[in-house]
C-alpha cells in the first residue's frame, strides 16, 4: 500500500512538472529585460510611498514613535534617534540617489546632501518624487549584458547592477513599512490599504 501511494505521488509530481514545462515553453517567448523587471518593482514602491507621504499631514511630518505612544505595561524601551516621518522620506530619497547612481554611473541630478535638511512637506514630497524619477532613468540602463557586471562596492552581496538595484527597491519597501506604522499611529489609513 505504501509503495502504491509513493508511486501515485511520483506520477502526480511528473504530471505537474510536465504541465509546468508546457506552460513554461509558451512563456519562454515572452521574456522581460532586467530593466523592465526592476522598473516594475520600483514603480510599485514609488506608488505606495508617494501615497503615504502625501497622506501624512504637514504638521505630522515631525512625528516619530516614542515610548509614550505605547501602553506603560509594555515597558517599551525606545532608543534615541528614531527617525521622524520627514526623515524617513528624506532618507529614502537620498538612498535612491546613492544606489541608483551606483547602478548606472549617472551623476545625481539633485543636491543629495541638502535633501537631509528638508523639513517642508511639499519640498520633501518633490525630492522623493525626483529621486524615484532618477531611479527609473538609472534602471533603464540595465541590460542583459551589464546586469551582472561586478561593480566597486563596499557592501557585501551588492556588487552587481542587478543586486544593487533590487536592494534599492527592497530598501524602499523596508522604510515604507515603517512609514505605514507612523501613519497608523496618527489615525491615518495608508492609501494603499484603503483601496
What are these regions (language model features)?
Residues 116-152, 161-175:
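Acidic/histidine-rich alpha-helical segments that form the ligand environment
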Residues 48-51, 55, 134-141, 178:
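Solvent-exposed, charged/polar functional surfaces in cytosolic regulatory/catalytic domains
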Residues 22-29:
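Boundary at the C-terminal end of the N-terminal hydrophobic targeting segment
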Residues 39, 43-50, 62-113, 152-195:
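Short, contiguous alpha-helical
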Residues 8-22:
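Bacterial N-terminal signal peptides
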Residues 29-37:
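Terminal, regulation- and interaction-focused segments at domain boundaries
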Amino acid at each position: 500500500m505504501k509503495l502504491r501511494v509513493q508511486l501515485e505521488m511520483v506520477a502526480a509530481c511528473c504530471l505537474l512538472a510536465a504541465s509546468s514545462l508546457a506552460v513554461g515553453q509558451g512563456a519562454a517567448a515572452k521574456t522581460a529585460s532586467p530593466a523592465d523587471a526592476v522598473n516594475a518593482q520600483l514603480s510599485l514602491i514609488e506608488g505606495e510611498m508617494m501615497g503615504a507621504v502625501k497622506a501624512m499631514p504637514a504638521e505630522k511630518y515631525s512625528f516619530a514613535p516614542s515610548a509614550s505612544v505605547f501602553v506603560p505595561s509594555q515597558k517599551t524601551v525606545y532608543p534615541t534617534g528614531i527617525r521622524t516621518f520627514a526623515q524617513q522620506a528624506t532618507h529614502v530619497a537620498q538612498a535612491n540617489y546613492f544606489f541608483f547612481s551606483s547602478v548606472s554611473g549617472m551623476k545625481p541630478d539633485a543636491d543629495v546632501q541638502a535633501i537631509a535638511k528638508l523639513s517642508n512637506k511639499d519640498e520633501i514630497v518633490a525630492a522623493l518624487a525626483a529621486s524615484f524619477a532618477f531611479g527609473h532613468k538609472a534602471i533603464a540602463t540595465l541590460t542583459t549584458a551589464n546586469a551582472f557586471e561586478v561593480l566597486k562596492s563596499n557592501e557585501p552581496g551588492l556588487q552587481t547592477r542587478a543586486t544593487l538595484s533590487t536592494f534599492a527597491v527592497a530598501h524602499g519597501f523596508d522604510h515604507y513599512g515603517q512609514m505605514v506604522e507612523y501613519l497608523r499611529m496618527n489615525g491615518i489609513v495608508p492609501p494603499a490599504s484603503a483601496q
